[in-house]
């Protein structure tokens, strides 16, 4: 009998997860199917009961359920406990266990463009939401030289820095302060929705003072090359688009469910094809 996998969220109609996971199942000769399920917030508990009853082997969790689903699972892995959010659920016997692959997915994509270890680099992150939390806590485990956060709401950024009390080389900045200090950073990571379709001309901050050796990352992947990444490319800076994080976190979920490693480059090609884009 086919094993069933899927993604739950709302909205979910434009999810590319079924495309990449079904292609990976087919490539590896695994008898399974991955389906997108639209689940309203007030239907989440019933949806989890359905997942149990139907014997679903694995589920990805997206907006708005990443936090609330934790109430309905049997166990939460340390990766998700630290973040206070779940993006992957795996059936383990008769138990449903929650994981989070977002932070590790970003770091895996980042490591492909770095020429130094994280411990030798200074980071600036723009944003303090759920994705920012995953990225910050994962990178900090690798003890960077410095990791500052800038956000429109300083209090929200401050709360995020407090999630890692043992890491001290961190500071909360306004956007203006970050722009003035930009030359200090080796890696600049944008984690908000600024520049996402349809507002494709928006940028979160100016890269005017960025160091010539800086790497600029944007987790937005629609468009693939955001206005921020275009500005970085025009300055001759190395860039990392959001497709990398999306594909790497998906691959980690796939491995959790099947024990097998999917073809990352094929996943990436599918996503780029669906977006109608080209590589940066």
Curated annotation (Swiss-Prot):
InterPro entries: Aminoacid_DH-like_N_sf, NAD(P)-bd_dom_sf, SDH_C, Shikimate_DH, Shikimate_DH-bd_N, Shikimate_DH_fam, Shikm_DH/Glu-tRNA_Rdtase. One of its GO terms (cellular component) is cytosol. Involved in the biosynthesis of the chorismate, which leads to the biosynthesis of aromatic amino acids. Catalyzes the reversible NADPH linked reduction of 3-dehydroshikimate (DHSA) to yield shikimate (SA). It catalyses: shikimate + NADP(+) = 3-dehydroshikimate + NADPH + H(+). Signal peptide: none annotated. The gene is aroE. The active site is at 66 (proton acceptor). One of its GO terms (biological process) is chorismate biosynthetic process. GO terms for molecular function: NADP binding; shikimate 3-dehydrogenase (NADP+) activity. Gene3D superfamilies: Leucine Dehydrogenase, chain A, domain 1, NAD(P)-binding Rossmann-like Domain. Pathway: Metabolic intermediate biosynthesis; chorismate biosynthesis; chorismate from D-erythrose 4-phosphate and phosphoenolpyruvate: step 4/7. The lineage of its organism: Bacteria, Bacillati, Bacillota, Bacilli, Bacillales. Homodimer. Keywords: Amino-acid biosynthesis, Aromatic amino acid biosynthesis, NADP, Oxidoreductase. Its EC number is 1.1.1.25. Belongs to the shikimate dehydrogenase family. NADP(+) binds at residues 78, 127-131, 151-156, 219, 242. This is Shikimate dehydrogenase (NADP(+)). Shikimate binds at residues 15-17, 62, 87, 102, 221.
